[in-house]
């Protein structure tokens, strides 16, 4: 009996030790589509911080395309990872990612971009941590209106140029949120003009804005709405080309890190500022949720909306970027 008790104790001790070893050696992946982007570098940095705080190792892998994504999941499984956070290079890879992860009994959390199935429908069964697109758009509209009032513009001589990309869900929700906030603040709906861009970059938005400007020679002051910094910058460049002064243009982008060189210019331009989201929150929160799911069996909510955003302008951008771990960019 004495021997039997000792054996039981040894088994119990081994179980405890193996459990603590699992916690000690727990590995979780964090896969991103564009590792060269400051946004994703910050997500990785704060995923590492979560790992340090909670006691797990973060395996960071760049996944710029579908093939590399599926290979990365194989590598994670080979290294003993129990799950991963991913910003996919293509939302349509969702079904393949989930199937492969299931095959290895790995947990998956999507960050920044939601998976869609083969029919293009959102895969809302996969937990998602994402910027609150509508709320950030609303904030853009509110800040534009506030700055317009500060400058004392005559509303009758002012208009909104909304550079849209409605085929992209995030873009549509941001620009719609912005226009709705402007209307709610009292800006006349009939003076809100939408123009679609062929691409969400400076050249695409520049062409779209030019086509709008020639249609409205009566407008003396423009508010520029776009889904990111580049679309707003394209709009600002177009107004400069048409002879508008910086004081008659207010553009507020979304992203922040792409606005640094513009906000650093010696002279102010029509690009007033940008809404800087929170890659630090995305990186830490998604990793923490994955850890709790794997280590404690606490299933994360299907949708976690991140609303933390700060307006950066020429006056505060260096300090605010530093706070987010994006300084020196």
Curated annotation (Swiss-Prot):
GO terms for cellular component: ATP-binding cassette (ABC) transporter complex, substrate-binding subunit-containing; membrane; outer membrane-bounded periplasmic space. The keyword DNA damage does not apply. The keyword Signal applies. Keywords: Periplasm, Signal, Sugar transport, Transport. It comes from the Bacteria. Residues 1-23 form the signal peptide. SUPFAM superfamilies: Periplasmic binding protein-like I. It is found in: Periplasm. The record marks 87 as: The binding site for the sugar molecule has not yet been established, but C-87 may be involved. Pfam families: Peripla_BP_1. GO terms for molecular function: ABC-type monosaccharide transporter activity; carbohydrate binding; monosaccharide binding. Changing residue 277 to G: Improves binding to galactose. One of its GO terms (biological process) is L-arabinose transmembrane transport. Induction: Induced by arabinose. Transcription is dependent on the transcription factor AraC, the cAMP receptor protein (CRP) and cAMP. Belongs to the bacterial solute-binding protein 2 family. Involved in the high-affinity L-arabinose membrane transport system. Binds with high affinity to arabinose, but can also bind D-galactose (approximately 2-fold reduction) and D-fucose (approximately 40-fold reduction). This is L-arabinose-binding periplasmic protein. The gene is araF.
């Amino acid at each position: 009996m004495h021997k039997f008790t000792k054996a039981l104790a040894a088994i119990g001790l081994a179980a405890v030790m193996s459990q603590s070893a699992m916690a000690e050696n727990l590995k979780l992946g964090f896969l991103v589509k564009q590792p060269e982007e400051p946004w994703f570098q910050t997500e990785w940095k704060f995923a590492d911080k979560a790992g340090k705080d909670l006691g797990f190792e973060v395996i960071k892998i760049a996944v710029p395309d579908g093939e590399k994504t599926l290979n990365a999941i194989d590598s994670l499984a080979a290294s003993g990872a129990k799950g991963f956070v991913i910003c996919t290079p293509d939302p349509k890879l969702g079904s393949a990612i989930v199937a492969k992860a299931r095959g290895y009994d790995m947990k998956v959390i999507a960050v920044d971009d939601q998976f869609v199935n083969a029919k293009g429908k959102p895969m809302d069964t996969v937990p998602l941590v994402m910027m609150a697109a509508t709320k950030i758009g609303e904030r853009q509209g509110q800040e534009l209106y506030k700055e317009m009032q500060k400058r004392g513009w005559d509303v009758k001589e002012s208009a909104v140029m909304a550079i849209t990309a409605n085929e992209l869900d995030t873009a549509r929700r941001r620009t719609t949120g912005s226009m709705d906030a402007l209307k709610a603040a009292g800006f006349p709906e009939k003076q809100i003009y939408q123009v679609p861009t062929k691409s969400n970059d400076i050249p695409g938005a520049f062409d779209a804005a030019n086509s709008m400007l020639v249609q409205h020679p009566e407008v003396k002051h423009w508010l520029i709405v776009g889904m990111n910094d580049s679309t707003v910058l394209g709009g600002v460049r177009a107004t400069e080309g048409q002879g508008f002064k910086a004081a008659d243009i207010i553009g507020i982008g979304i992203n922040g890190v792409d606005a640094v060189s513009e906000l650093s210019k010696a002279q102010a331009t029509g690009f007033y500022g940008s809404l800087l989201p929170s890659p630090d929150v995305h990186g830490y929160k998604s990793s923490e949720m994955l850890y709790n799911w794997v280590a404690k069996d606490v299933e994360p909510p299907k949708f976690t909306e991140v609303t933390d955003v700060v307006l950066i302008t020429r006056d505060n951008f260096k300090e605010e970027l530093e706070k987010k771990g994006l300084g020196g960019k």
